[in-house]
Amino acid sequence: MNTVLLGYECEYLQRTRGKVDGCATFYKKDKFRLEEARQVHYYQEGSSLTNRDNVGLILRLSPNSGEQGFCVANTHLLYNPKRGDIKLLQLVKLMAELDHMVPNFQSNPVILCGDFNARPHSFMYKFISQGYLRYHGLQLEDISAQRHGGGRKFLDIGLIPSNLTISDQCRYLEDHHVEMLRRSPVLRGQFHSYQSSPYHHFHYPQVSQNSGFLWHKFHMVSTYKHFIERTGEPEVTTQSNAADSSVVDYVFYSVDGRESKSRRGNFNNRNVIEGRIKLLGRLGLLSQREIKSAGNLPNFQNPSDHMPLLVKFLLT
């Protein structure tokens, strides 16, 4: 199918070091114009945490009708269930790139989508939805909740390599700001005190590194509920084999406010206050039982091991 004939423009980013796949975002050129495209390469020499070839892509689009624009971020994070530290660091870099591109998410809302290789209610999911995470002491295999037990490796406070120049707030440190921290004894003392302070989500320091905590400024909500109301079964977006189905693909969108609640391993957002982007509907997903009855994935109707996610928004 020729997407150009259908009226779409495409931004594509190939994975690094010659990998043939990558991330692509298509948009209707009669509806939107591209204001900026930002490529996110997670690969960076100098650390075993940044030597993977996954990528992300962020587009700032504006309606041709003249309304204010919005951003769409698309990514495919590392699969390896045992390396939750790498997945989390890739997510940190993506959020830092979004922070750089979107100074105010209320006037410039964000749609965040892709294959995050993390299950609902995992620590990765909670970080996106809550806006903060205490990662110090987490077991690597538990971060994405794709595999439990058997691991004996835990995250230390030094998750973010210094050469990334990203703070615990998922924000790039400007060179002059880094120099200011180095020169000022007062700020340097505050800087180091974050390593041991018992922060909660309502404590959001302006800048810190190696505190054992992460924050980001966006109020993100999943467009899917991760269970099927008509059957009460969990949703499925991918099937690696006939016995292993799960949700790893998501479409999040930024809202003006929400209450985040976590209870008994389940995570929910309540009292969501939508902003300029309003959720109108979504294409329903299937359960593992229903996919199995259809012949598992991939099959003739769905030639991929992932199910498509389709969401309808109103931009105001």
What are these regions (language model features)?
Residues 99-111, 117-316:
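Metal-dependent phosphoester-hydrolase catalytic domains
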Residues 1-4, 11, 27, 88, ...:
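Amphipathic alpha-helical interaction motifs in eukaryotic regulatory proteins
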Residues 1-79, 83, 151, 251, ...:
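Structured beta-strand-rich core segments of catalytic domains in phosphoester-bond hydrolases
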Residues 31, 43, 47, 93, ...:
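Short, surface-exposed, charged/polar-biased interaction segments
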Residues 16-20, 46-53, 66, 80-92, ...:
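Intrinsic disorder
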Residues 56-73, 87-113, 118-121:
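His/acidic metal-ligating clusters that form di-metal
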